[in-house]
């Protein structure tokens, strides 16, 4: 994880200050290996997750250029894979199915817009550019 990913995320917002604090610390926790700093980032990240009702693991694979509109009540399974330039809005669930023909987690392509209160569950693939 490099500084470039955080910069790409910043570019998706009109002003850098518009990026949700949750997202900033999500990327910082992913990219920092210096223990004292990583510990501080993890504490802040965990606090923001609780306040915003967001369940995204620091190990979740999300490409650069992430845009979170209204960062609240979002759940993404740690095994899901999200591409570059994804838009995610409040109430989104990206989850796992544990049985049946769609057992597994979603793979979401690049430049996908995921609207309010959308649930994507199971082993499905959402193609590039889907809205």
Report the location of each language-model feature:
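Terminal amphipathic alpha-helical/low-complexity segments used for targeting or macromolecular assembly
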Residues: 1-53
């Amino acid at each position: 994880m490099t500084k470039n990913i955080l910069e790409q995320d910043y570019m998706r917002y009109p002003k850098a200050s518009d990026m949700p604090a949750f997202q900033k610390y999500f990327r910082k926790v992913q990219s920092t290996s210096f223990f004292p700093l990583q510990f501080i980032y993890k504490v802040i990240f965990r606090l923001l997750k609780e306040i915003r009702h967001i369940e995204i693991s620091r190990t979740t694979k999300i490409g650069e250029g992430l845009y979170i509109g209204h960062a609240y009540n979002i759940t993404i399974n740690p095994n899901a894979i999200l591409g570059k330039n994804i838009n995610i809005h409040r109430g989104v669930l990206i989850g796992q199915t544990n049985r049946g023909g769609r057992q597994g987690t979603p793979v979401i392509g690049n430049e996908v817009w995921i609207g309010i209160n959308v649930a994507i569950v199971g082993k499905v693939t959402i193609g590039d550019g889907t809205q």
